[in-house]
Amino acid sequence: MKTKKLIWMLAAILVICGACVMTCCNSDEDSVVSPTDDSSQFVTLTDAVPDAILEIRYYGTYNFVGTRIDGYEEPTALLTKQAADSLKAVSDDVMAQGYRLKIYDAYRPQKGVDHFVRWAEDLNDTLMKPYFYPDLDKSVLFPQEYICLKSGHTRGSTLDLTLFDMATEKELDMGGTFDWFGPESHPDFCGDPETGEYTGDNSKSPAEPKRSITAEQFEHRMILRRAMLAHGFNPLDTEWWHFTLKDEPFPDTYFTFPVKQLK
């Protein structure tokens, strides 16, 4: 009887551990259960936000994989109607401050996420390591949740973006590139995002000498953050560029249709 009880206990532990692995994800990427290819509730982002600038990194080759990502058939961006409406309010807000929104990614089909997973499993493919994860061994990308099996982007109300300065005609200097894998991308790196106070605390940087960002670069991140939060988006605690609509319409659905102009 003791042996049988022990076997049942071990089986239960394995099930729990397996579930933890399968749901590895960032804080805004809850478990989703319903796949669909229905794009009827989506809009082309630039139709809703005509002042936005697009630089769809996963359509090109300058990204952490180094090739075009599966599912990105055209260099466009799609969002749910609700997220696009809120983003228009963000755009109007930052335009009044002299900035435009620059979009790196929005809706991401599940096949794009699957592409990331295959890439992460190939530890020999480190082509883009010098540009996006020079301080990390590729083997930690799964354990540290830089790459996960599911993404909030597949739900259609998440996007990655920065600010473009209309006076200088350049991106605002955020002190780090989009998709940089490391603590330097965290909103609380060198400051407190809740108060907007710059502290200069770079102790989490794994580099030697440690990387840092300036007070001005931290404030640039805060300008974007304040505008997004003011219009209904939630931030992610590991990426300064990543936001999800708080009241997203499809919290339990992930979409599979490709990224291309909607008809």
Provide a role label for each language-model segment.
Residues C25-A106, Q110-T238, E248-K263:
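Extracytoplasmic cell-surface/polysaccharide-interacting catalytic and binding patches
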Residues M1-V33:
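Bacterial Sec-dependent N-terminal signal peptides
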Residues F243:
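Conserved metal-phosphate-binding beta-hairpin within the catalytic cores
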